Amino acid sequence: MRIAVKRMCGAAAALAVACMASGVTAHPPSVSRVPQQVGELEDVITMRLEGSVVVDPAGKVVSHTLDTKLDENLAGLVRKAVAAWTFTPPVIDGNPATVRSKMWITLAGRELASGYEVRIDNVNFYNPPDPKNAAAPDKPRIQLTSIKPSPKYPKYNVNGGITLLVRFSPDGEVADVAATQCSLYFAGGRATDKVAACQAMISNATSAVRKWRATVPAELARAPGGLTGTLPFQYIGLQGAELVAASGEPGQWRRESRTRYAEPAWRDDGTQRVGSSDVADGALRTASTPLRLNAGAIGKVL
């Protein structure tokens, strides 16, 4: 399921929200009041990479692949970093296990006088359906059943995205929702207007999502973190839409002005961090994975 929300409010068609506007510079509306809950934005370049990893019962990396085509120097640095990762020994159904998983790696570069310093910004682990085994039963997942009202487009002409951490109740109502991060893509304008644009995007999406509903399988309702997922929203303008789409592809750099990632107090310990820099679509991302990276991997300079 996908959602397409135009500026005047469009029809539901996907669990992605694309809010349409014109322009890519954060311009203030007629009355501008910047709420305090959004802090200063940092300017970075980001890139998403696809790959896979095999982790043994001791938490060591047995093998790994990097599927995204990269400059060989950068690819070599990423492979070296992944090979050195260590994990909390993985457990499945109470037993030590070897785990094979797909992964998304997010790189972030910050400009220095001598160039860009690139770090591993985040890693997400997931297992997509096997297209070669169509007969395999679908894994239980949360299904959105009502996605109204649609978020209103803010009074700023921007391209950007936010991520909301959503916790459902077993009966499918939204129990908690909190914004975790906001990114503006290739945005100009004053810093205060960028902050206000992020605040408006967050406020509008949060207000709408509180009224949404879902079907929650009983199996997930009993599982740690099973009621929680990250819901990305994208606000894409008529100007710059192609650039934003292209820069969201794996292996491409995207310029962002973003808030710091923030977690609500109610976040489940097992929930994966998924921020606005980690996504290029609007799919609901749930928390389930037996892999837990040990400290030191995230934030490591390549």
Predicted regions and their residues:
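Bacterial N-terminal signal peptides that target proteins for export
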Residues: 2-12
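Charge-biased low-complexity segments
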Residues: 2-3, 23-302
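N-terminal signal peptide c-region/cleavage motif recognized by signal peptidases
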Residues: 18-22
